[in-house]
Amino acid sequence: MKLTMSAIIMLGLLLGSAHQSAAQDATQTLYKMKCQICHGPDATGSAAGKKLAVKDFTSPEVQKQTDAELLEVAKKGKNKMPAYDGKLTDNQLTELVKYMRDLAKAGPKGK
């Protein structure tokens, strides 16, 4: 009985980990498809994004914004950033904000 319970717990942990990894992979793919062209691979802004005055997502100025403020920009757009309300789900946008925050925590590549 003890072995069976341990096996069930381990299976649950493995399945949960696989689900989380798949969700993270989906968000990373979505970032690459929708965001990276302007925000760059590390959220500091690509060459094209910098020409459009994209803000460095790793900067204190951007990081002090709340998730709700960042979601509002993602939904409605701002300046040259397109609006994604109706194009992406609220969950996708929320996960993208989390992903970009993780990129910001990791810091710019090469620094």
Spans of features found by a protein language model:
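Extracytoplasmic electron-transfer domains, predominantly the class I c-type cytochrome c fold
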Residues: 52-105
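N-terminal export/targeting leaders of redox proteins
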Residues: 1-25, 109-111
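Generic structural signal for beta-strand residues in well-ordered domains
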Residues: 6, 14-16, 28, 50, ...
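Short hydrophobic/aromatic-rich motifs at helix boundaries and adjacent loops
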Residues: 6-7, 41-43, 69
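Periplasmic/extracellular electron-transfer cofactor-ligation site
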Residues: 28-53, 78-82, 102-111
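Electrostatic cytochrome c docking/interface patches
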Residues: 14-30, 46, 67-69
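Compositionally biased, intrinsically disordered low-complexity segments
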Residues: 11-12, 40, 65
